[in-house]
């Protein structure tokens, strides 16, 4: 594909200047995509840019999130995190894990992604979705017009499922493990109050809703979790195993529904991702 949106390496925002630069480049790219030409700039503006680095700059102030800056919220959410990190409800997982993987992102996010359980990379780093599947998830999030830090990402199971000694890889969480750990996720959702949630893979769907069904049977239509609309879609690991454009398009169609539900703008280029016109 010539316009594959999920193959670009993600550059982390290091400071406020980089954040502003990334946002500016994103806006300029959208202008080009929507109008079919590069935006123009006057020679006077270019001269100003040449001398801009000589002036003292102040860090950009991020726009406050709804509910951010509430000391009580921050204290209680931090308390939930600490309690989760200390959990030993599954003794076998408490013994085998490197650390509990609580979740990451904006605790006031309007969009929340839920996976099944940490893998080896996540267990080592203490953050969900940081391996190859996580890198693909980040690209999907960015193709939607978000930054990874704008959304919230968590798993049904907070500990990596244990493996027999000498055996590599990851295993699926058991129903009992997910049932035991689910209250932690439910409390996270209660705090975050996302407008929309996305479950990634059949195991996450089972762990959150108790639905033992194939994702192919339910994807593309809205489900419900205590009044929060849920879109079930394939796990990014599935897309790594199955590189068919048709499968990528299915996931992207699910994400387009999410964007529409959130009232987010969708460019014509975004609507064409993984279609014949983009091949």
Q: Model regions: which residues?
A:
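Intrinsically disordered, low-complexity regulatory segments in eukaryotic proteins
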Residues: 13-21
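A polyanion-binding, active-site-adjacent surface
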Residues: 22, 26, 30, 37-279
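Cationic, low-complexity basic patches in intrinsically disordered or flexible, solvent-exposed regions
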Residues: 5
